[in-house]
Amino acid sequence: MQSTDTKEKNKNASGAVEHTPLMKQFFAAKSDYPDLLLFFRMGDFYELFYDDARKAARLLDITLTQRGSSGGAPIPMAGVPVHAYEGYLARLVALGESVAICEQIGDPALAKGLVERKVVRIVTPGTVTDEALLDERRDTLLMAISRSKHGYGLAWADLAGGRFLVNEVDSADALEAEIARLEPAELLVPDEDNWPDFLRGRTGVRRRPPWLFDADSGRRQLLAFFKLHDLSGFGIDDKPCATAAAGALLGYVEETQKQRLPHLTSIAMEVASEAISMNAATRRHLELDTRVDGDTRNTLLGVLDSTVTPMGGRLLRRWLHRPLRLRDVLLQRHHAVGTLIDAGADADLREAFRALGDLERILTRVALRSARPRDFSTLRDGLALLPKVRTILAPLDSPRLQTLHAELGEHDATAHLLISAVAETPPLKLSDGGVIATGYDAELDELRRLSTNADQFLIDLEQRERASSGIATLKVGYNRVHGYYIEISKGQAEKAPLHYSRRQTLTNAERYITEELKSFEDKVLSARERSLSREKLLYEGLLDALGTELEGLKRCAGALSELDVLAGFAERAQALDWSQPELDHAPCLRIEHGRHPVVEAVREQPFEPNDLDLHSDRRMLVITGPNMGGKSTYMRQNALIVLLAHIGSYVPASRAVIGPIDRILTRIGAGDDLARGQSTFMVEMAETSYILHHATPQSLVLMDEIGRGTSTYDGLALADAVARHLAHTNRCYTLFATHYFELTALADESHAGGASGIANVHLDAVEHGERLVFMHAVKDGPANRSFGLQVAALAGLPKAAVTQARRRLVELEQRGGESHSAQMAPTALDAPQQFGLFTAPSSAAQEALQALDPDELTPKQALEALYRLKALL
């Protein structure tokens, strides 16, 4: 179906109607960018017409109006003021829209007829580099995806940071995991069918002609862009799918940016085996930087991020989403953090970094020649800090810190250039003048003196004219439209001297010009124009000079970013009482007094620490206990401790010894602070299936309440089968939380079979009168009660409903046994069972009596037990 814009243009082309010259100009520009919103410059506004106007009015909540008519019909129109357009542009980009900026070319006042207009810039969600359009603590990525019969090729670029990377994956699941990790703002895909469901409806997806995703074409494009003869230096010579994606991305960038991209100097191949794998579900369940409800507060990143600079914050986020398996790299990071703590140098670095600014993105704008005056002053101030940073680092005995010290480089000449060339506090825009410092250029200083002396000349002229004319209220002034003038009120206008020439008539005054004032105006305005022109020339010279230093400056910015992250790790370790983890070669996961970093940070009460001990002969813990008892928190805290250790951070534990880990996989459908009943049984089984197919003996797996989304017996059977598969086939490290107490018998089976791979632990609660107190301490062995009814009462269920539930529980316990036993035998269910919903004793009263521990019962519990026993007789 054609858009209204296209129909209107077609009418014009067919000759059925005739459009105004302005609308013809609009349609000509719009025809080149039919899928983009066109910001059409008209004086002090960017106007949008037809469908663009309707869409912008809806998205931006601005007024939709009409601008006369063209082609025999009213023209829908909406607009935003030029002085405030960046705010509107940022909102559109955040919504996944792309915008073409069509500017007026030349001076409208000098144009004969219709002023010329031209699209000078295209802004898309993945290609923005303007500071006002970017989230300073999050990468803005453009990604392209190609596919072949063997899998998918990915290429992504951070244009604002100057990074360009590629990867190849072998499945749609792996593709989804990468997209979840990188969160691209814009995604380029071939316009073909049969793409995975998770791409449908995603914001920012751009369908492009399939021929753009060709491996041979991509290779030629990359060779031409980087001016190379082969791609072997980048490690992608044998990666045709990734090469195809990279070529498609590069073509899109060149098409939209309309300029060279000198800051993209290389392309890197990510190696999947170097990082711990986490699928999309795991990232969601662990709430690394966003909670499952979409909130960004109370996340791991929120607790961990103590970086001072925006570029440090972005690097930390990248590290958090790609924990490394490279032991030597991690040991160097841990050692660097410890060295900073021991020397007390982290505080000194962080204090120095507070004046640093976002050098990484500033250097990109320098490379693209879009840097603003205050980018120069920020870069100047940042480079001026380098001697202090080098002094702090010089005595520190840490291999990584000394490597970063060397990567800072020597930039004294560049710093001196900026100190001498840039004003202390430059204006926001070059066109305002005053960017170049006084004393840097003699010609500019002379032109400025002419402008400066003009103020005194005008004061003297005003006094002389008042005296000679006898008009005490006479004023000398200036405006941009009419230039300099002598203003006399209407009541005094008849006293104007004969040599005054009228320049402008106002409601209450007349404005005049004299030969002397005209001569002065020509001289001063010429000086100001020449001054601005000279400043622009000098400004371009600064960009040229900095352009030759970009590589070294980018390395320096990268080193400063990492120092910021490491200093932040040191600050967090001391403030939160975290310890240095130990990375072992042997398979193990031993954590002493571990805590959940986020829960501990937000809770007012002290956090109950817990231990974890997994190794070759003890790979699975079956975790039982009451709802709200802390099972999910315990599981996730151990996963987060492992993750923190693998980004180079200290960890919330008194000691952590961690063997090789290749994956963290989770299935958490409901629980403490998780999605409230939104998981479906199909999602549960799909995520479980992924884990069973991908977990290895070096994987850490969290399974929370498997089987609760279906019937009791189906759920129990599935939970039993999944646990057995993980323990005996995958043989991974597994934390298996369940409300099926029958599964605790798996540990007994394991011991009986001579393989002690499964153990039971539980979290308990204690009743004090009407109150239920959760202990949050992990203890050996299975739980002996579920406290389900007590938790229901705590949740606010009416007392009548709870009472009815108690009666129903007794009935089910009395009647529910035989069919249950028949269905599940012989399984873990043959072992002694908890007295509860799924019990199947041959003698219910006898079994219930054996389950009682008189020393543990409160008077109220004893009375309830007596009533239950009586009902079973």
From Swiss-Prot:
Tell me which SMART domains the record gives. Answer: MUTSac (SM00534), MUTSd (SM00533)
Q: What is this protein called?
A: DNA mismatch repair protein MutS
Keyword Lyase among UniProt keywords: no
Q: Which Pfam families match?
A: MutS_I (PF01624), MutS_II (PF05188), MutS_III (PF05192), MutS_IV (PF05190), MutS_V (PF00488)
Q: Which UniProt keywords apply?
A: ATP-binding, DNA damage, DNA repair, DNA-binding, Nucleotide-binding
**GO cellular component term, pick one:** cytosol
Q: What does this protein do?
A: This protein is involved in the repair of mismatches in DNA. It is possible that it carries out the mismatch recognition step. This protein has a weak ATPase activity.
Instruction: Specify whether DNA damage is a keyword of the entry.
Output: yes
Q: Tell me which species this is from.
A: Xanthomonas euvesicatoria pv. vesicatoria (strain 85-10)
